[in-house]
Each structure stands twice: as structure tokens, then as C-alpha cells.
Amino acid sequence: MIKLLYPKFWQKQNIIAYLLLPVSLIYQFLGYLRASLAQPIMLPAKVICVGNCSVGGTGKTQIVIYLAKLLKARNVSFVIVTKGYGSKLKNAAIVNARHTVLEVGDEGVILVKYGLVIATKNIKEALPLINELKPDVIIVDDFLQNPHFHKDFTIVSVDSQRLFGNGFLIPAGPLRQYPNKALDAADLVFLVSSTNDKMLNILTPYVNKLINAQIVPLNNIDKTKNYFAFSGIGNPERFFSTLKNYGLNIVGYKIFPDHYNYLQADLENLYSLAKEHNNATLITTRKDYVKFHDLNNNIVCLDVELSINNPNLLNEKIFKKAQIFN
């Protein structure tokens, strides 16, 4: 898998983005061709698909966790299907607590705490396992742009800091598909992190299906210490903002590519950087923390959860449309 940092030209239109537009047109055509030729299959349960229209972290994992807790509280059987990003996964697998990130991906290792999880590169390859588990609901983490299976309910996650970047498709911009298409088709739109008038104006046409959500810390962390933050996720800036908003003294930070698999040498380098910054304590995300399974470390992990301002809208939309819930 190619691992990239979020390039600066994805956020604002400039000469590099314009030079890459012809390649974006090819990407758009291939996506159209793929969708036109696809024959969507029906999965053996109701499908809730959580995705985004842009590259990078938009809070999808936290939304999936929120849904898992919601369904569990209603005694609805479900399975989570995730792509296994950053893993060496070859065949679809039911995730267990002994699996590592290299085997099933960071999302799989995190999500297994909240319910049954299948890690797969191809949704069709997961079918035998889904049939074996017989869930009432399938929560699909990502796969939003995959036209090969029917989706009963779609949730599009939008990060309020980056929004839609420069508005161009990959590789000229961060978009997997144009926002209007994704948002028009969505049953719910999650706006994750802080909001402002500009964002709300852009999303005004979708106000009847808009969920405002915040990423909030779960654990108590010593605020008297200095911290050196590092992260290899899709949107590290949001993580750093969360740390500062929480009142932590961040004296330095280092960004790694998304879904980065750390080596012992990386850990040693991070310890050196922390020492150079007033003997700071290392702090990172849960997605990064789970990758240090085999490495000795003394790292603080910031655990977070999703807090939404209008849960009644979420409940009403999902339970009313799905029609299978108790």
C-alpha cells in the first residue's frame, strides 16, 4: 500500500493542482465506468455504510463505534466490515483480540472491542463469513464509493477543518467523489469537530439530515506534564487540536503517513525527540498506539469518543428507515 501525507496543495487551488487536473479527469472517468458496469449484490442483512467523499480522517471510526454501541443497546445483532488498511491481509477474516495491526489493520484491532468485525479487502469475499454470522445489520466502514453492493443507509462524514479541500478530485485534490453527489445521496451527514458560519452555509441544503459531532477525550491525562505528540492518521491536525483544546502543553509534534506501521527505530527516534523537547512525554492516538503491540514503550494514549448534539435525529433516521429495529 502506498502511504502518503496530505499534501498542502490539496487544501488550496494552485499550479500543482491545476497541472494534475488531467489525471483527475481520468480518475473521474474510471470511477464512472466502474459504477456503470457494476452489478450491485444484495448482502444478507440491512447495510449501514459509513464513508466520506475525501481522502484523510473524517471521524469515520468514531461514527462506527457510536453506531455499534447504539445497536448493542437495542439488542440488534450486527457485524462491522472494515477494509484492513495497513495490513497484509489476503483473505477475509473474522477479527479476534489476538490479531495484530499487520494482520487485520488498525481499525479492525480497535473495533473488535465493540462487536463482531470482519476485515476484508473485497466486500464479496466477506460474504461467506457474513452468512456464517447471520447478523441483522452490517455496518460497513468505508466502501462508500464501492458500487458492487447495495446500501440501505449511508452516512457521510465531513471534517470541519479541511471540509472538501481545494474541490478537486484525486490526485489534484483530496476528493474521491464530488461532495454534492455524496451528500445528496446520503441519509445522514456528520459534520465532525468545530463548526463555523462558512461550513454551515455550505451544508445548509442538508440541514434536515445534518448531525453536528465533536471528538471528545475519554481519559484523564496529567495536564502538568509536557507532551510530544505524534500521529500517523488521516487528519493529524485534528488530533493536535484536540490535545490543545484539552489543555495539554504540546511542546512538539511529528507527523507520519496515514496507516503508518512503526518500527523500533521510529520509537527510538521519538524518544530522542521527546527528550530534546524538555524531556516531554510521548502522546498519540489509539490508532497509532495499537501498532506498538510488540514494542516496549512508555507512551500516553488519548482515547476519544463521539459526542453528537442531536441523537434523536440519528435514532429517528436510522430506526425509521431500516424498519427492522426493535
Curated annotation (Swiss-Prot):
Tell me the route in metabolism or biology where this protein functions: Glycolipid biosynthesis; lipid IV(A) biosynthesis; lipid IV(A) from (3R)-3-hydroxytetradecanoyl-[acyl-carrier-protein] and UDP-N-acetyl-alpha-D-glucosamine: step 6/6
Sorted keywords for this record are: ATP-binding, Kinase, Lipid A biosynthesis, Lipid biosynthesis, Lipid metabolism, Nucleotide-binding, Transferase
Query: Which residues are listed for ATP binding in this entry?
Result: 54-61
Q: Which GO terms describe its biological process?
A: lipid A biosynthetic process; lipopolysaccharide core region biosynthetic process
Q: Membrane-spanning residues where?
A: none
- Return the GO cellular component terms, semicolon-separated: plasma membrane
Question: Which EC number applies?
Answer: 2.7.1.130
One Pfam family this chain carries?
LpxK
What is the catalytic activity of this protein? a lipid A disaccharide + ATP = a lipid IVA + ADP + H(+)
Q: Name one GO molecular function term.
A: tetraacyldisaccharide 4'-kinase activity
What does the UniProt record say this protein does? Transfers the gamma-phosphate of ATP to the 4'-position of a tetraacyldisaccharide 1-phosphate intermediate (termed DS-1-P) to form tetraacyldisaccharide 1,4'-bis-phosphate (lipid IVA).
Task: Tell me which family the UniProt entry assigns to this protein.
Answer: Belongs to the LpxK family.
What is the protein name given in its UniProt record?
Tetraacyldisaccharide 4'-kinase
